[in-house]
Amino acid sequence: RDTIGNWSTSGSFAITIDNFDKICSQIQAAANTCDLVLVNAGSSAGSEDFTAAAVEKLGRLLVHGIAVRPGHPVIIGFVPRNSAGVSSKEVPVIGVPGYPVSAALTSEIFVEPLLRIWQGEPEFLPVILKAKLTRKINSPAGDDDFLRVVVGEVNHQWLAAPLSRGAGVTTSLSKADGIVIIPRNIQGLEAGDTVN
């Protein structure tokens, strides 16, 4: 809720236990009354992660998993709004990973841009600067890796210091003032490499 606190919100639904039928019921109730449904957690591939199956049962599951890290198990789909048993407008559903850093990144990549478009606001264009990476970073091939960094100027040169990583490392959210995107075809960066 804090990540999108600046945006207009119309509803919040109770936490639902990991039960397929109850999750289906809550998603449908939200689709019936809201323009966008965000489901937090339950998007991975565990035995208690029912969001993808629920969206698929209720409507159309478009994506389950994207090539970004953190945030890989994102779900994107549509569920029809039902009014008096009649289906009408399809409502977008985004399944947000449960880990906080993954959830924040998912909001930055998918939720905020969608809300900006709907509200007629301009696209967010971040300040981009070139900086030298302060230490070596390993990155798995196949995913765009979003690395949170602290940026500072030392001796007239910008430096980017990588923060601790992991989908649950919340200090990276509060301390970061920059993000370095390591493309999926690169398996890491060396200390001293220039990054944006």
What role is predicted for each listed range?
Residues 1-39:
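Phosphate-binding glycine-rich loops and their immediate beta-loop-alpha structural context
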Residues 9-13, 41, 120-127:
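Flexible, glycine/charged-enriched surface loops at secondary-structure junctions
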Residues 16-17, 44, 68, 80:
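Residue-level "edge-of-site" marker
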Residues 23-25, 49-52, 78, 105-106:
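Short acidic, glycine/serine/threonine-rich loops at helix termini
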Residues 40-41, 135:
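Short glycine-centered, acidic/aromatic-flanked micro-motifs in structured strand/loop junctions
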Residues 42-48, 98:
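Short glycine-rich anion-binding loops that position phosphate/pyrophosphate groups of nucleotides
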Residues 46-59:
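Short Gly/Thr/Asp-enriched flexible loops that form oxyanion-binding sites at enzyme active sites
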Residues 56-196:
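Flexible glycine/proline-rich
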